[in-house]
């Protein structure tokens, strides 16, 4: 309907197809979820947000990548070949120093996570997943 794009890209680039669109869609969906639901008295803001979300479908790769990562890190004790492969496939570069591995997302030092070389308890993988999810997704 509009002649100009609704949004323009900034300087950040997609690390994988549709990544930035997913971040924008997620922010819009969160806002939409927080709006009051009034069946008999619709909200213009809710209608606009829903319309934008409907017009901008995406593959939802973030959810797939998070599920793969959560599966791989379940019960983490040490960096196995399966975990290493999953981390690399998701976009992490793995370097080791001392008692930790350093995970750098798409070789961008702004997005690093430290991973113990040996997990201290069964929650280690869950905690690592939560930290990665917070920093990356």
Regions found by a protein language model. Name each.
Residues 55-137:
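Long mid-to-C-terminal scaffolding/interaction modules that assemble large complexes
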Residues 1-90:
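Extended, charged coiled-coil scaffold/tether segments in eukaryotic proteins
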């Amino acid at each position: 309907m509009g002649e100009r794009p609704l949004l323009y890209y900034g300087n950040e680039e997609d690390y994988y197809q549709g990544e930035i669109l997913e971040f924008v869609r997620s922010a819009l969906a969160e806002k939409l979820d927080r709006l009051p639901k009034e069946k008999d008295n619709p909200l213009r803001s809710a209608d606009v947000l829903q319309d934008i979300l409907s017009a901008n479908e995406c593959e939802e790769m973030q959810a797939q990548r998070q599920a793969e990562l959560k599966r791989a890190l379940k019960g983490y004790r040490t960096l196995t070949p399966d975990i290493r492969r999953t981390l690399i496939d998701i976009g992490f570069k793995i370097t080791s120093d001392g008692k930790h591995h350093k995970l750098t997302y798409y070789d961008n030092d702004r997005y690093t996570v430290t991973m113990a070389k040996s997990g201290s308890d069964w929650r280690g993988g869950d905690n690592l997943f939560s930290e990665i999810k917070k920093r990356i997704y």
